[in-house]
Amino acid sequence: MQPRVKSVTHSERFLANIGQKRCFNLKIDHIAIAVEDVEKSARDYQEAFDVKDVEFETVESEGVKVAILHLENANIELMEPTNDSSPIKKFLEKRGSGLHHVALETKNIADEVTRMEGCGIQFLGKIRSGSAGTKVTFIHPKSLSGVLTELCSKP
């Protein structure tokens, strides 16, 4: 009788290492939603969730204008493209408005990237500047069951 061989995906390998390799340092920072009109969408979300304050910021390097709504345990980030080469513009053309990514915050993004790469996780580019002075990078959706995931580290 031959031994049974199980194929292990990147996601399974990553999840198997959670308890051993400090993944408990991660927490949900925000859920990002691509929208056509960030001002209108921000008003809709403010009314729906009774959020008083919204922060607006343009991130030139990413080609987006964002509205950040602060909830008790996480944030909602609404993203509108500011130019035709924005990845959000392409996302909207292909899929329409909707969930774009989930962001996880870590205290040390460089260490977390190194750890995750050791688990076989693939990244889309290097660590770079994000909104509100954060450092960010994105995990390839193929590494985590089709979900685009951002890692971020606050100053």
What is each of the regions a protein language model found here?
Residues 18-42, 97-106, 155:
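N-terminal beta-strand motif that seeds the catalytic metal site of vicinal oxygen chelate
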Residues 72-76, 83-85, 109:
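Short, charged/polar surface micro-motifs in flexible loops or helix N-caps
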Residues 28, 42-45, 69, 76-79, ...:
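Short, structured motif recognition centered on aromatic/hydrophobic residues
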Residues 59-75:
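C-terminal "cap" of GNAT-fold acetyltransferases
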Residues 27-29, 41, 48-63, 83-100, ...:
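A cross-kingdom feature marking solvent-exposed beta-strand/loop segments within repeated
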